[in-house]
Amino acid sequence: MSTREIRIATRKSALALWQAEYVKARLEQAHTGLQVTLVPMVSRGDKLLDAPLAKIGGKGLFVKELETALLDNEADIAVHSMKDVPMDFPEGLGLYCICEREDPRDAFVSNTFDSLETLPAGSIVGTSSLRRQAQLLARRPDLQIRFLRGNVNTRLAKLDAGEYDAIILAAAGLIRLGFEDRITSTISVDDSLPAGGQGAVGIECRSADVEIHALLAPLHHVDTADRVIAERALNKRLNGGCQVPIACYAVLEGDQLWLRGLVGQPSGGTLLVADARAPRAAAEALGVQVAEDLLGQGAEAILKEVYGEAGHP
């Protein structure tokens, strides 16, 4: 393969294609004459839309097929939503670029109500995330949480059809797809802590492709990467994936990194929260530290219960 050509493995969803096109445009802007093509494919997570993610189980639901394409030399890089990327990579692959983060917050979307606070008791709220469910029910145990999967357009259509009083989505996805006007209100990270890596785009490639690594370097955003490294370290220590009730969010404060982590019962009955600060150079250690604090509060028992109900380890 010539280093003047890059093939991007991507899922076929509108949001995934937006992310891949974004990376394509950035690469072409940074490297005159570089040919960039997309290799769209369907992941297991895209096929299994009739069950909650926690019930499907397994990590890498949205990335495994893309990684296979890299290993089989059918593509040169794979573009992912960072919140979907497992903590560990197959031998020969690695994460070599994290792009600048979009708004990491969750968004409240409703055609009738202005905010989570104004929802009447008994309102039906759609989400596919145990993380969101745990935090929503902790604040509003009077709400009904109903399963919601599908791409952004599908979820909005279900809301518009009256199946839900409100739905909760990642603000970043709505903004990127041009649906910012559908965001009724953004939810503060104090009220709904995001998933680790939410709003960030990551690029995976073969570890041996040093020329590709060099081409990706201009797209790497160090401030975002340091935050996401801390968040992912917490997730890794808790053995978490995108389908468990773990939340974490890091903020840069000068040369210091602040990280908050949360583990919650899906019922909202118990929310465990921990936070700490450390020099940004110690991002990974900070993630482990906050995870250890959560484990000391009893996070392991909550996560074992969730995994047990889902029927997978």
From Swiss-Prot:
Cofactor(s) required, per the database record: dipyrromethane
Single Gene Ontology MF annotation: hydroxymethylbilane synthase activity
Sequence positions bearing S-(dipyrrolylmethanemethyl)cysteine: 242
Transmembrane region(s): none
GO biological process: protoporphyrinogen IX biosynthetic process
Organism superkingdom: Bacteria
GO CC term, one of those recorded: cytoplasm
InterPro entries: HemC, Porphobilin_deaminase_cofac_BS, Porphobilin_deaminase_N, Porphobilinogen_deaminase_C, Porphobilinogen_deaminase_C_sf
CDD domains for this protein: PBP2_EcHMBS_like (cd13646)
Enzyme Commission code(s) on record: 2.5.1.61
Pathway it works in: Porphyrin-containing compound metabolism; protoporphyrin-IX biosynthesis; coproporphyrinogen-III from 5-aminolevulinate: step 2/4
Reaction(s) the record says it catalyses: 4 porphobilinogen + H2O = hydroxymethylbilane + 4 NH4(+)
SUPFAM superfamilies, per database record: Periplasmic binding protein-like II, Porphobilinogen deaminase (hydroxymethylbilane synthase), C-terminal domain
One Pfam family linked to the record: Porphobil_deam
This protein's UniProt keywords: Porphyrin biosynthesis, Transferase
NCBIfam families, per the entry: hemC
Family the UniProt entry places it in: Belongs to the HMBS family.
Summary of subunit composition and partner proteins: Monomer.
Protein name, per record: Porphobilinogen deaminase
Organism: Pseudomonas putida (strain ATCC 700007 / DSM 6899 / JCM 31910 / BCRC 17059 / LMG 24140 / F1)
Species lineage: Bacteria, Pseudomonadati, Pseudomonadota, Gammaproteobacteria, Pseudomonadales
